[in-house]
């Protein structure tokens, strides 16, 4: 995950907060995160958000999708196939501070720059859609607000922010699911910390308002929140 110039949340610690973490451990953890995205609602949340933005767009035209904090690149990679079946041509790009993560994303077919979300090497309105999934909760409130504003400035068409909805049942469900899938102890601990760092619906709405965007916030299966908005070019 990209920390860079953004302040990391003081609520617990996660392996992926540290860009200097052991590459082998990062790789294993990101593979488990990708499995969690598939089975616990992360990929479905992204599809939902993208669907809201793509539904009014003409089919067949290339659409650039920038995934900030792309991890292993599994979410944009899956989104490309999903969109293709609906007549949309997504062109994915990733941004990651972690070099091992960037390498994984590139190997999955997602071109990935090594950079931080606080200072992305991109011009304003340089991509069509910006995706930021399960990234905002890693940061302080002030930095998450800054991240939202960065997304809004980069996107020509719209933004999808997907994150975790905090709750006791979410933690219980993750404990059961991560055990069933055989996640390692580090991934389990990081997942529980991520849930603790997650948002309520009201918290995410308030954060977006402070950031200056008028977004639609939806609750989705798997204790997910998805915010979408169209940008003003």
Locations of regions flagged by a protein language model:
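A conserved beta-strand element that flanks and buttresses the S-adenosyl-L-methionine
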Residues: 131
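N-terminal auxiliary segments of SAM/dcSAM-dependent transferases
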Residues: 1-19
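Conserved beta-strand signature within the Rossmann-like core of class I S-adenosyl-L-methionine
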Residues: 155-164
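A short, conserved alpha-helix within the catalytic core of class I
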Residues: 139-151
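Class I SAM-dependent methyltransferase Rossmann-like catalytic core
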Residues: 23-49, 53-54
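Class I SAM-dependent methyltransferase SAM/SAH-binding core
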Residues: 66-68, 72-119
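Core SAM-dependent methyltransferase catalytic element
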Residues: 215-233
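C-terminal alpha-helical "lid/dimerization" subdomain adjacent to the S-adenosyl-L-methionine
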Residues: 164-208, 217
